[in-house]
Design a protein with these regions (language model features):
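N-terminal, Lys/Arg-enriched amphipathic/low-complexity engagement segments
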Residues: 10, 15-69
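Short, structured beta-strand/loop micro-motifs enriched in basic residues and often containing a Trp
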Residues: 20-30, 70-78, 165-173
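A generic structural signal for residues embedded in beta-strands
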Residues: 47, 91-94, 190
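Short, Lys/Arg- and Gly-enriched loop/turn segments at beta-strand edges
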Residues: 52-63, 99-109, 196-206, 305-308
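Intrinsically disordered, low-complexity linker/loop segments enriched in Gly/Pro
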Residues: 98-184, 189
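Conserved mixed alpha/beta catalytic, RNA-binding, or beta-rich assembly cores of soluble enzyme
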Residues: 152-176, 180-266, 278
Length: 325
């Protein structure tokens, strides 16, 4: 469905608003997919995006559902949307206009699929169901509240290479980015590799920290409104974006607690910084291992603090203390 319209040839441009429902989905990137919608530069699209498990997790689910969860395919994403006039060598800009969360969501820890997957504490699964219907935040446990900063975990274009491509790894043209700063007010710029660009989005999170260390944010369905434009003959090397506000947004209200880890391997430093944060949350806030890892995943920001003081680099994990009421 579309609203608005175009005037006759030579008249002023009148942008349109289009709607894609939950049935306009696919599971792989593919430059040969027929577009679900074709739009002009300047148009807006309202996407009804499903959650990623294809209905396997419901509001009534318990941790037992993870024992039979089918991850093939991992994502169902909305689109693709073709932009008229888009060609390889151009850049597509996408303005994030609005994201409206669903009434509930979930986070889970799945064995073998998290930052600390080799730790014995995480050899068993864990599922957290969130009530997202109480305004702009959700209770994790009594005394711990997570503010919403919703964004699409997946936003990207069809790769130029032929065939089907997994939605799991991020790419030059975007994809499974999980960049929590891609919130309302942000404008993205992505290089185009295939005619029409073929944009798709999904995997919406109500909140997530930088790192998504348990493997999920607060996963949910959502209504996502995006505005598209085209930069002809201009090509960015990879995704770039401009934010309208502060990096920390609603998190920065009461200071931060931080753990650090050093060493010559940034991956190991990242794991250790989160291990130390999990230990602190267990000790200071009486959380279980799984609860602590989920809280880190939805609220803790990982940062590379320095990469010049060889042979050791520093990774910092920062947790906003405003979560604790």
């Amino acid at each position: 469905m579309s609203t608005g319209g175009r005037t006759q040839q030579g008249g002023p441009f009148v942008p349109r608003t289009h709607h894609l429902d939950k049935n306009a989905i696919h599971y792989r990137w593919n430059r040969d997919l027929p577009p679900a919608l074709e739009i002009d530069p300047g148009d807006t699209v309202v996407f009804e995006t499903p959650e990623i498990t294809r209905g396997q997790i419901t509001r009534e689910s318990t941790t037992d559902v993870l024992n039979t969860l089918d991850f093939d395919p991992v994502h169902q994403i909305s689109g693709p949307v073709a932009i008229r006039g888009a060609e390889p060598g151009d850049t597509l800009t996408v303005e994030i206009v609005e994201i409206r969360p669903a009434a509930w969501g979930y986070s889970f820890v799945f064995p073998g699929f998290n930052l600390l997957k080799d730790d014995p504490a995480f050899e068993t699964p864990y599922l957290k169901i969130w009530d997202l219907s109480q305004g702009d935040r959700a209770e994790f446990k009594p005394g711990i509240v997570i503010p919403f900063e919703p964004f699409c975990g997946v936003m990207g274009l069809a790769p130029g290479a032929p065939g089907e491509h997994s939605t799991v790894p991020p790419r030059r043209v975007g994809g499974n980015l999980d960049i929590r700063q891609l919130v309302v007010g942000t404008t993205m710029a992505m290089p185009i590799e295939t005619p029409g660009a073929l944009f798709s989005c999904g995997d919406v999170h109500a909140a997530q920290g930088d790192g998504e260390v348990c493997g999920t944010g607060i996963e949910m369905e959502a209504t996502v409104t995006l505005r598209f434009d085209l930069l002809k003959g201009q090509e960015v090397p990879e995704l770039q974006f401009r934010m309208a506000g502060a990096m920390t947004g609603s998190w920065n209200t009461a200071g931060w607690f931080c753990t650090t880890a050093h060493g010559p391997d940034l991956w190991e430093n990242t794991q250790n910084a989160i291990r130390y944060m999990v230990d602190w949350l267990k000790r200071e806030h009486a959380l279980t291992d799984h609860e602590a890892l989920v809280l880190c995943s939805v609220a803790c920001d990982l940062k590379i603090s320095e990469t010049v003081d060889a042979p050791n680099w520093i990774v910092t994990a920062a947790l906003p203390l405003g979560l604790f009421t």
